[in-house]
Every structure is written in structure tokens, then in C-alpha cells.
Amino acid sequence: TTGNATDFGDLPRVTTEAGGFASATRGFTAGGYNPSYLNNINFVIFSSSGGSNDFGDMTERTWGTNCLANSTRGIIMGGRAHTDDNPYNGGYMDRILFVEMASGGQDASFFGDLLRPQEIGLTAGQTGTLTGATYASTTRGIVAGGGTPRTKVIQFITIATKGNAQNFGELTQEASRVTGFSSPTRGLSAGGFNNTPSSTKSNVIEFVTIATLG
């Protein structure tokens, strides 16, 4: 149906820059910022109105995490980790974490590492991702593109098994701050900033077939 949004409930605190992922029955937020870095994982039950509930914690206080999920496992990738309470002074995370969404609650566990630098402001030797597009099938999770220096690189993981991200292919252009969404078979990246010239806003929509490499 069409119509305006209706109030569902509240987060435990005012939060910006949190990651989000979901199963068929639960929605999750991970990390965020206000007034400092957060490591909370919270969840709501879609079928009931009300506020969010505490699920567990991430290994680091992090904002800007890229998140995705299949039907059972939620994945938390990258982000900017706490070094002090300035949101732009943190280090860049290459870590991938996971939770089992149907559990009664648990802290995130280590899954693997991302491939390469992907966040605005990275310097040589830093790794992480904050601004790529994410999408998933029942078996694979993908993060595409990312920050400065902007990249075309698309990375993937196999959600059911632990391990580092692997190279999937490339976008048609370098892109950061990209929106990602998917069906069970096809992942799309939309908009963002590209390098034609530097920091040009984009209206480009690209797609990949998630089950293939390329």
C-alpha cells in the first residue's frame, strides 16, 4: 500500500551513521555515533511495534559500518573505529564481523578482513571501507566501490563460511558514497560520487549478477 510512515518506536539513544541489516523477522542496527562512537547492536521485531532491544556488542566502537545479511547471519564490515570522540579522528577498520540473527543475543564474532583502502581520507597502509554499496544473496555478500582514493573494486564473501573478502570484479567507474540494494540474484549500485571530474555527483545505476564473478 501507499501512505505515510507510522511511528514504530525508538532506539536506545539518538544515533547517526549506524549500519543496518535484517532477517525476515528482525531488523538490526550496528554501531553509530552520538555523542561518541558506539559498539551497540540493537534489534527490533518487525511484527510488533515498540523500541529496539539490546542484542550484543561489536568488537570495536565504530560508526559507518557497511552491513548485509542472508536469512540467518548478519555481516558487519569496516567502518571507522574509536580513537577519540571526534567522529573524523578514528582509524579505518578492515574487519568483518558476524552475528547469528535468530539467537537470543550475542556479541559479534570475527569473520575475516576486507581487501583494500576504501574510505575517504585514507593514507597509505590503512585499510577499511565506509562508503561502498552493499548487497547480498542467500550465499554471498558484496561491497562495491568506496572512498578516497575512490575505487572500482568489488569484493565478496561467502556468508556461511568465515574468511577474508575476495575480488569479485569492478564497477564501471570509481565511486564512493554509493547506495546498494539487491534481489536474491542481482545487486545494484546507485549514485554516489565519481572521479569525472573529482567529486562529481553521479546518477549512474550499475548491476552485477551476484552468483557470478565479473
Label each residue range with its predicted role.
Residues 1-214:
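Polar, enzyme-active/binding microenvironments
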